[in-house]
């Protein structure tokens, strides 16, 4: 195992971004950015041993800080996903967060994702990043430090560990926003990739994709991924929790899950290459997002690739969206 560092580029007003490359003994490697403690690439073999990059991203570091391009690969904090009306209360005190998506907050306002993180520790097979947010920054209480540790193994396991510390009672919902395309060919949509989600319920949403406080059953609906099947089989079916033309952007409630219990949440499989990915988590939910909000004409990605509509699927482990405001949802 080895770790190498290189300069990735410069972002005005933020500084230089570095990439840390962790290579295992079999030649597979991951590249991690100081920008947003993000994943720049994951290069793993297909069934014939050929390496391919299975995540979307950019050659130009400045593209990563454009929120319209989907938070590619970036860590998200303080609070991932949605907060209705950009506010929540703790012990009777109301806190107001940025309205960066209409009338509500998305991904805590984006600060954690679009800033350069410190490198706290580097080992033979891991890198740990940290970011500090002062009390009341973006409306969140507490002097708050978040660390993200990435460890890569010879078995091609990428482990992500989040630690959050605050000197006041606060909220936290960290996740990672990497988009996967196991074909390693971004000209192919993720509609032909196979997905299984170990969940029989999802959080119901309104027309703005904000949780209503109800949980829906996946049974006999397009939301059912309890067995492995193609993402594209029903992605365009009309359904109350889906916005026409967007496809999946929904939180699934993992089977009878308790926080801290590590279980398998999802399986992603590409038939053409034989690549198979398991997602394990100790959190209670997973957001499945197929890039339906990305521009259909796309943006230049890495090499000759494109970052565009339905070219990658994000599998974001998390607490349920807007759980700070919904008492029925266990957190």
Question: Which residue ranges define each predicted feature?
Answer:
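Extended, loop-rich substrate-binding clefts of extracytoplasmic carbohydrate-active enzymes
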Residues: 1-16, 21-25, 94, 98-155
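Beta-strand-rich N-terminal accessory domains
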Residues: 6-58, 84-95
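Active-site loop/turn microenvironments that scaffold catalytic and metal-binding pockets
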Residues: 52-112, 211, 223
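Acidic/His-leaning functional-site neighborhoods
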Residues: 107-112, 117, 244, 250, ...
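Conserved small/polar residues in nucleotide/adenosyl-binding loops
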Residues: 329-331
